[in-house]
Amino acid sequence: MSKKLYIKTYGCQMNVYDSVKMQDLLYPFGYEPTENIEEADVIILNTCHIREKAAEKTYSELGRIKKLQDTRTKQGLSSAIIVVAGCVAQAEGEEIFTRTPYVDIVVGPQSYYNLPELISKVVRHEKHLIDLDFVEEAKFDQLPEQLYPQGTSAFISVQEGCDKFCTFCVVPYTRGAEFSRNVEQVYREALKVVSSGAKEIMLLGQNVNAYHGKGPADKIFSLADLLKHLAQIPNLERLRYTTSHPIDMNNDLIKLYGTEPKLMPFLHLPVQSGSNKILKAMNRKHDREYYFDIINRLREARPDIVLSSDFIVGFPGETDEDFEDTLDLVRRVKYGQCYSFKYSPRPGTPGATRTDQIPEHIKSERLTILQQELMAQQLAFNTSCVGSTMKVLFDRNGKFDDQIIGKTPYMQSVYIQNPNKSLLGKISDVKITKASLNSLTGEIL
């Protein structure tokens, strides 16, 4: 009888990718995935530590799992093995056992390949096992190739870690130093997902445009080199990558938007603030003028490119004038979509030790103002698409039986009513007939 594996994933696309790899890793050991936590023999929470709220979600979920375990015990059933993985595991380590002693395993992002051994030890009644080693090479070398098809769009991790040490961010401490997979590993995985039906690949990394992987004849490939190499794969229609840092947007990568049709005209390029003072305090290593220059060069290379970004409001020391600089940057760049958050002090980061923290009510006010501007820009961009014809990659069924959903080159969701379901997995011309804040509606041509 097969054993059941339940994985709940929090946070970034890298965590989504890691969860798939953990699933693939445990399958040969008899663990089949389930979406029903109540029947699981192993429960893995793949966690996020980027903000306090995200981290506390882990403990809330663990509390619910404890109640489930208690119910199973009363019914005479065996308890599930509980695993905390991801960035909360890396950041908090033994503290997780202190707060939630019923957790069996704590494993960091670079140590997933040891899960089968760790789980087997728990089966043999060992408890409170922890593995937080930072050995990126071992992770990439030992995690399995894809077993379950990812679908029409696939994630491939090509780079992990961060050397930037922004003063608000825990990633260098939870994911380690920057490390790039070798080109052959990435290419082989890309061939695998395309042969399984993927039309689009998203390359992932904490600083993906810092990629510098070893290729044939020991040549070092940049991200631009890697994208050009992958673009040669037959039946691969679209390439994307995330997340990027402005200082790693080199000329070769910018120019590629004008020469490689498979590279989609959409870029997520976090800036975090529009104030030079705050950018310096964040240790972002660039100023607003540098960011504007990148945007201008991207638009010269690909006039229809659409930008996305991340913003943090209420970083320590942020004045009204600093916040106005952020609003000014947003209005000058004009984004297609964005993510914005209140600053959340993370333990162990320089920002958390500053004495000039911004009151919560001011952070909330600024976030509301910023989000109103960003939502207005997003709606304006979506509305500008009405009447146009776009190539849409249909990748999933809608909520209703008579609906399918795809995405444009600009990452907008497009809903089609009464479609031919054979369109799933294909790229089709769609006339956009209606726009809302978060999606488009269209008709097949």
Curated annotation (Swiss-Prot):
Query: What Gene3D superfamilies does the entry give?
Result: Methylthiotransferase, N-terminal domain (3.40.50.12160), tm_1862 like domain (3.80.30.20)
> Radical SAM core domain: which residues?
148-380
What are the recorded GO MF terms, alphabetically?
4 iron, 4 sulfur cluster binding; metal ion binding; N6-isopentenyladenosine methylthiotransferase activity
Q: Does the keyword Metal-binding apply?
A: yes
Task: Give the UniProt subcellular location, in the record's own words.
Answer: Cytoplasm
Q: Which domain of life is it from?
A: Bacteria
**Keywords per UniProt:** 4Fe-4S, Cytoplasm, Iron, Iron-sulfur, Metal-binding, S-adenosyl-L-methionine, Transferase, tRNA processing
**Cofactor dependence:** [4Fe-4S] cluster
Quaternary structure and interacting proteins, as annotated: Monomer.
Q: What is this protein called?
A: tRNA-2-methylthio-N(6)-dimethylallyladenosine synthase
Species classification: Bacteria, Pseudomonadati, Pseudomonadota, Alphaproteobacteria, Rickettsiales
